[in-house]
């Protein structure tokens, strides 16, 4: 019988993406900081909306 040498690929070859924990330069924000920042920006936008009377 003929011997079949099957080559198997790693899991990433099957469409699964592997992410590595490489430290990169830049700002590191926690999810809590992102939520608080979003709320602050929203409040500033709402305050500007009610304090300006240009075309409204």
UniProtKB/Swiss-Prot annotation:
Residues 53-56 are extracellular. The chain crosses the membrane at residues 31-52. Keywords: Cell membrane, Membrane, Protein transport, Translocation, Transmembrane, Transmembrane helix, Transport. It comes from the Archaea. It is found in: Cell membrane. It is a single-pass membrane protein. One of its GO terms (biological process) is protein transport. One of its GO terms (cellular component) is plasma membrane. InterPro entries: Preprot_translocase_SecG, SecG/Sec61-beta/Sbh. Residues 1-30 are cytoplasmic. Its main location: membrane. Involved in protein export. The function of the beta subunit is unknown, but it may be involved in stabilization of the trimeric complex. Component of the protein translocase complex. Heterotrimer consisting of alpha (SecY), beta (SecG) and gamma (SecE) subunits. Can form oligomers of the heterotrimer. Belongs to the SEC61-beta family. This is Preprotein translocase subunit SecG. The gene is secG.
